[in-house]
Structure formats: structure tokens, C-alpha cells
A protein has these predicted regions:
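An interfacial alpha-helical scaffold signature
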Residues: 1-273
Length: 273
């Protein structure tokens, strides 16, 4: 007989979970099982049974080195999460959250009910939206003189200086352009964060794991914003204003989402299992 464990996707209020019968949900992470709600009083965890031998801590770590195995299951996890998060308020859990026993899931829902209920209330009616900030280096360098007061002043002085001095000043200008471009990007990124944070309930600046260069330029910053559904239009308008304001500097904003609110319950989900 195959020993089973419980894979947990998210946590919701039991009343909300009742609106999503399991027959209406997407496929579970493994073909051999179906999704089920594990309910204790006012809280429910969305779960499915998985082979314990495959999902034990040691064996799961080994399976995660298989890119194909991981990609298939990560996609199933995300499909479930996006479906549920669009319909009810949930605390999304990270890929690979496992409980060996059903009693462990029930105990967690019991012991941490106040914390869970508080987090759900904070997330109610809200979505996570991503904002990626790209910069076209060539465009920025060509426009940096108009963006930077320091360079603008130096260019004016060089134009009025004698030829020999003007040449030296031009060399200095070319060197300063790189430094000023870097500083300008940092200022712009900080401003975008400040303005969009004012239009949201919370914000996170995410770590860029690797340098990404696209047709829009190099990725300079990634943000996650917690936005009330009822106020999304205002948030989007603010993002569009920032995009227009910084377009001349070669900066482009990409709005993505809505996503399950992973980045606004990390402290809890990291401790869940």
C-alpha cells in the first residue's frame, strides 16, 4: 500500500471554500488524486494526496533537480492557485508545502486560526500586481544631458570654453554620462516605487535573480503591489503616468497580474510546514 502525504495549495475561509466545490477545480498536482478541502471550523486548506515517497523532504529535493518534473508540477500548482485566487480570498502557499498526516493540516488550522483569519482579512478584496521597470541604455545616454542638471551645466560651460578646454570638458562629459545615467535610473526607480506605493496598500521591491535584457531594454527593478480591486483603475492610471513621465529617459513600465498574493504573506507561508 502506497503511503500518502498531503500537498497544500492555499488556505481560505470555510464559507468561501464552500462556494468552490472540488469538482469545479482544476487538476491536482498529481494525476492520481483530486483536490479536496480540509476544513476545521471557519478555515479550510485546499489539499491533494501525493505519494509520501516522492514528496518526502529528501526525495522532493532530488526531484526538483529534474527541470521537466518540476515545470509540470509548478504549472499545475499555479493553475490551481490562479483559479482559486480569482474567486475567493486565499493565503497562497509556496510550491512544495507538504504535511505527512491529515492531522497535521487540521492541527495547523486549529493552532494558527487567529493568525490565519487576520491575514485573510488583510488580503480581502485585494490583488497582487507586478510592475517591471526596463531601461533602454542607448536612449538614456542620448537623453541624459536633458535629464541631469549637472551635465546640462557642464555642456553649457563647454560650449563657451576655449577649444582646448572645451575638448577636455567634453571628455569629462562622456565619462560623467555613465555615472549620471546610473544615478538617474536609481532616482526614477525610487520615484516609481513611491508614487505607486501611494496608490496601493503595500509594496515589495523584489530581488532580480538574473540580468534580463529584452526589446524594451534591461530590467532595472521588479515590484509587487497589493492593490484593492475597487481601486485598480487608479493604480493603473498612476502607472501609466509614470511610464509617460519617464519615457524620454528610455524607461518603460510593464504591468503584470493579477497574481495570487505570494509576496504579501511570505512571513506566514515560509513557516507553514
Amino acid at each position: 500500500m502506497v503511503e500518502l502525504a498531503y500537498y497544500i495549495y492555499c488556505i481560505a475561509e470555510s464559507a468561501a471554500a464552500a462556494q468552490l466545490p472540488v469538482d469545479s477545480l482544476p487538476a491536482a498536482i498529481e494525476d492520481t488524486s483530486k483536490l479536496e478541502w480540509v476544513s476545521v471550523n471557519t478555515l479550510s486548506a485546499l489539499a491533494s494526496q501525493v505519494p509520501r515517497a516522492t514528496y518526502s523532504e529528501e526525495n522532493l529535493a532530488e526531484h526538483l533537480t529534474d527541470a521537466t518534473w518540476t515545470a509540470i508540477r509548478a504549472m499545475r500548482h499555479e493553475t490551481v492557485m490562479e483559479y482559486v485566487a480569482k474567486r475567493v480570498t486565499v493565503i497562497p502557499l509556496r510550491f512544495g508545502t507538504i504535511y505527512l498526516e491529515l492531522s497535521g493540516v487540521e492541527q495547523m488550522l486549529t493552532d494558527r486560526s487567529r493568525e490565519l483569519e487576520s491575514i485573510i482579512e488583510q488580503l480581502r478584496g485585494r490583488e497582487e500586481w507586478g510592475v517591471n521597470v526596463y531601461c533602454d541604455r542607448a536612449v538614456l545616454l542620448s537623453s541624459i544631458t536633458s535629464v541631469s542638471p549637472v551635465l546640462r551645466d557642464l555642456v553649457q560651460r563647454a560650449e563657451q570654453a576655449p577649444p582646448g578646454q572645451s575638448y577636455l570638458m567634453q571628455k569629462k562629459i562622456e565619462t560623467l554620462k555613465v555615472d549620471e545615467a546610473r544615478a538617474a535610473v536609481n532616482r526614477i526607480v525610487d520615484q516609481i516605487e513611491e508614487r505607486l506605493k501611494a496608490q496601493s496598500d503595500d509594496a515589495r521591491r523584489l530581488r532580480i535573480l538574473k540580468v534580463e535584457t529584452t526589446e524594451h531594454g534591461e530590467l532595472k527593478a521588479k515590484f509587487a503591489f497589493l492593490v484593492r480591486r475597487a481601486e485598480f483603475e487608479e493604480f493603473r492610471d498612476a502607472a501609466e503616468r509614470q511610464a509617460q513621465e519617464h519615457q524620454q529617459a528610455g524607461v518603460r513600465l510593464e504591468l503584470t497580474g493579477p497574481w495570487p498574493v505570494y509576496n504579501f504573506c511570505t512571513g506566514f507561508s515560509d513557516r507553514i510546514a
